[in-house]
Swiss-Prot record:
One GO BP annotation of this record: steroid metabolic process
PROSITE patterns attached to this UniProt entry: MFS (PS50850)
Activity regulation, free text: Transport is chloride sensitive and transtimulated by glutaric acid. Transport is inhibited by anionic compounds from different chemical classes.
Keyword annotations: Cell membrane, Ion transport, Lipid metabolism, Lipid transport, Membrane, Steroid metabolism, Transmembrane, Transmembrane helix, Transport
Gene that encodes the chain: SLC22A24
Gene Ontology CC annotation, any one: plasma membrane
Superkingdom of this protein's organism: Eukaryota
InterPro entries: MFS_dom (IPR020846), MFS_sugar_transport-like (IPR005828), MFS_trans_sf (IPR036259)
Family to which this protein belongs: Belongs to the major facilitator (TC 2.A.1) superfamily. Organic cation transporter (TC 2.A.1.19) family.
Listed name of the protein: Steroid transmembrane transporter SLC22A24
GO terms of molecular function: transmembrane transporter activity
Functional summary from the UniProt entry: Renal transmembrane organic anion/dicarboxylate exchanger that participates in the reabsorption of conjugated steroids including estradiol-17beta-D-glucuronide (or 17beta-estradiol 17-O-(beta-D-glucuronate)), androstanediol glucuronide (or 5alpha-androstane-3alpha,17beta-diol 3-O-(beta-D-glucuronate)), and estrone 3-sulfate, as well as bile acids taurocholate and glycocholate, driven by an outward gradient of dicarboxylates such as glutarate or succinate.
Length: 552
């Protein structure tokens, strides 16, 4: 396309692109922990009812005699089916007779129990405090924990829809700066939230901006790189997510108070906000939106940074206008979100992309937001997941470049469902195998997400890329919001949530097959580019063949 010619002249992968991608990698490393922060700040420790004989400091040794703590626990808390103290019930009166019984007593003589009316006692060996221990999000209130995660994802859903559209209207740069500021304020204030309601509101606002920033880093990186470098760029950005996962695991291991952990994750965002003033706007977006002078200014700036002094001097408005004449003529037709529904090929692409994003996102967040269900040491498992996803994303780069976008997605998406479904029906005693399958599932879904991100951004035109990304993000974040809510199905069957996580990626496979291949093709700039994709692709392939022949 026209802009790729200009970008090749100023440097498609030079010092500027390296610095840009490095900044976005740092951004992703510092922002991604915000998405899975509730793995630690909302960790649910072992707990039991508060009972006077055990936990009341005013009760003297004379009242309990020489009874051990285990004996006092036995007469105060009933046992569950696994012969462990129940988490949500206690005896109304101490059952002294249990000290003299080796087994259980008949059902007709079962003593009366009551809920934990005086609160709970928590095991603080893993974390000194979490939002669960601070606001007692256990027993009847345990669903509120999932609600926090869903509110964050709901915020990201609305943020992607609103900010995605605004990014196409006012530019990527200004929206990024606004989101950095919003995230820095809301996430920092969340550490000092006086009530659970205030905390939920602040996390909703944090979600509103987090995913928008991450999405815009992808878009800006894509719009400043050439097709031959695009897969590598996306892979590097996604690998930075994995580094962020490992960073959070290390921080959570060292910091056991949720307030301090929240602040530690939030304060670096202030530095990112200050640094964002040095960001460049997408010249591709500026030119497509008839801001030729600003676009030319950015291109000259990039040429200067990349050491292309001759190109910097020869770049003129006339050159830009003539090179991108086709695109500029096409965008004179006013486009809006409704243009998607008037273009049949683009419409079908968007529908397909939305379903694939939804189907991959549900198991992705279902796994990474519920690490507590997969392993006992959450911090270690978080670091392990980061290392596995990093490796998986590197592997996906090879498949993207050698097998194409569609085959790469299918190669990783289908096994996700298989790993989860097999893991669902394994007995709890096979802990090592369960952890191995869960880890493979997380690696596969990360590689599938990597392949999908590359493919999705290459299928939509520049003029509507952020808008489509916002719509696509809505379906993805609907899946992200649904993932923690599906865990409430455990009240009916412990297998139901995991069966749901396993079925969705399998259903995505036939949809992926319907999407066109985009490997080594230039980014479409207009709706007409998408509607004429077959003709343009055939011409490009013919040009590539001619180039290969003339090289010998």
């Amino acid at each position: 396309m026209g802009f790729d010619v200009l970008l090749d002249q100023v440097g498609g992968m030079g010092r500027f692109q390296i610095c840009l991608i490095a900044f976005f990698c740092i951004t992703n490393i510092l922002l991604f922990p915000n998405i899975v922060l509730e793995n630690f700040t909302a960790f649910t420790p072992s707990h039991r009812c508060w009972v006077p004989l055990l936990d009341n400091d005013t009760v003297s040794d004379n009242d309990t005699g020489t009874l051990s703590k285990d004996d006092l626990l036995r007469i105060s808390i009933p046992l569950d089916s696994n012969l462990r103290p129940q988490k949500c019930q206690r005896f109304i009166h101490p059952q002294w007779q249990l000290l003299h019984l080796n087994g259980t007593f008949p059902n007709t003589n079962e003593p009366d129990t009551e809920p934990c009316v005086d609160g709970w006692v928590y095991d603080r060996s893993s974390f000194l405090s979490t939002i669960v221990t601070e606001w007692d999000l256990v027993c009847e209130s345990q669903s509120l924990k999932s609600m926090v995660q869903s509110l964050f994802m709901a915020g990201s859903l609305l943020g992607g829809l609103i900010y995605g559209h605004l990014s196409d209207r006012v530019g990527r740069k200004i929206i990024c700066k606004l989101c950095f500021l919003q995230l820095a304020i809301s996430n920092t204030c969340a550490a000092f939230a006086p009530t659970f309601l205030v905390y939920c509101i602040l996390r909703f606002l944090a979600g509103f901006s987090t995913m928008t920033i991450l999405g815009n880093t992808f878009i800006l990186s894509l719009e400043w790189t050439l097709p031959r470098s695009r897969s590598m760029t996306i892979m590097v950005l996604l690998c930075s997510y994995s580094v962020g996962q490992m960073l959070l695991g290390g921080l959570a291991f060292a910091i056991q108070d949720w307030h301090i952990l929240q602040l530690t994750v939030s304060t670096p965002i202030i530095v990112l906000f200050l640094s964002s003033w040095k960001m460049v706007e997408s010249a591709r977006w500026l030119i497509i939106n008839n801001q030729l002078d600003e676009g030319l200014k950015e291109l000259r700036r990039v040429a200067h940074i990349n050491g292309k002094k001759n190109t910097e001097e020869t770049l003129t408005t006339e050159l830009v206008r003539s090179t991108m004449k086709k695109e500029l003529d096409a965008v004179r037709i006013k486009t809006s979100i409704f243009s998607l529904f008037r273009a049949p090929k683009l419409r079908m692409r968007v529908f397909g992309l939305c379903f694939v994003r939804f189907a991959i996102t549900v198991p992705f967040y279902g796994l990474i937001l519920n690490l507590q269900h997969l392993g006992s040491n959450v911090s270690l498992f978080q670091i392990l997941c980061g290392a596995v996803t990093f490796t998986a994303r590197c592997v996906s780069l090879l498949t993207l470049n050698h097998m194409g976008r569609r085959i790469s997605q299918i190669l990783f998406t289908f096994p996700v469902g298989l790993f989860i479904l097999v893991n669902t029906f394994l007995p709890q005693e096979m802990q090592i195998l369960r952890v191995v399958l869960a880890t493979l599932g997380i690696g596969s879904v990360s590689a599938a997400s990597n392949s999908a991100s590359v493919h999705h951004n290459e299928l939509v035109p520049t003029i509507l890329r952020s808008t489509v990304a916002g719509i696509n993000a809505v379906s993805g974040r609907t899946g992200a919001a649904l993932a923690p809510l599906l865990m409430t199905l455990m009240a009916y069957s412990p297998h139901l949530p995991w069966i749901s996580y396993g079925v969705f990626p399998i259903l995505a496979v036939p949809v992926i097959l319907l999407l066109p291949e985009t490997r080594d093709l230039p980014l479409p700039n207009t709706i007409q580019d998408v509607e004429n994709d077959r003709k343009d692709s055939r011409n490009i392939k013919q040009e590539d063949t001619c180039m290969k022949v003339t090289q010998f």
